[in-house]
């Protein structure tokens, strides 16, 4: 998760003899995360696919065919939550489960995050009649930002938060 990323930066800095510089980097990343939390306080409920607290129901599509997403073991669940969303697959066992199209249809996401890569440029066909597709709530985030738990996760967090709640980032 994000806290572990920041701890790892500091630990590596200590090991490599650059503890002060590493701490400054980790501190700056933590400040960016804290700024997102401040902006996302008091989310307005503005759509039918939002929870009562304003969080958006999100499906993260890692691969279009076969359809892979994030499950309970993925660090990306925390990222979606910190960005003002709730992963509709957070309770599925495994970190990156393959799911059926029937399961995907039943999830009813309000937004779809695509891990942007050449084989994952659009939502799986199972979502063609979903609210997310009909309302154009399909967002691409560079796969390099999402695929590794490192400093770039903060960039991904900022992008996802802006996509899910553009009204808060004017």
Language-model features and meaning:
Residues 1-15:
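Flexible loop/hinge segments that line or gate small-molecule binding clefts
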Residues 12-15, 19, 32:
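Mid-sequence acidic-hydrophobic segments that form the walls
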Residues 16, 164-169:
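Short, hydrophobic alpha-helical segments
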